[in-house]
Amino acid sequence: MVGIKVREVYKYENVELSNGVKVSAYEVTVQDGEVVTVSNGNVVVNDKQFSFSIYNYGINGEKTYNLNNVPADIDGQEIVKEFVVFVETDIA
């Protein structure tokens, strides 16, 4: 028998990352311990905010980051990557 890939969906609200960054994501899909998609993500940094989603495409599992309205002085992709690491550590 071949193992079955199990997907689980999590909800995170007001997760505090480094430097006071807060992230909420209402549909975080995890498969085999790895974040594969995030829908309805929101980040608040110093009273500024932006939204994001993540999709996992292709055989190589490459992640596509969709960031919306990121302020010019904020590295949105690094914040989202930090959130992914947080989630994968949290569920391990």
Indicate residue ranges for each PLM-predicted region:
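Negatively charged, low-complexity tracts enriched in Asp/Glu with abundant Ser/Thr
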Residues: 1-37
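Surface-exposed charge patches in extracellular/virion surface proteins
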Residues: 5-7, 48, 77, 81
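A short, structured beta-strand/loop element
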Residues: 33-63
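Mixed-charge, Lys/Arg-enriched low-complexity segments
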Residues: 53-92
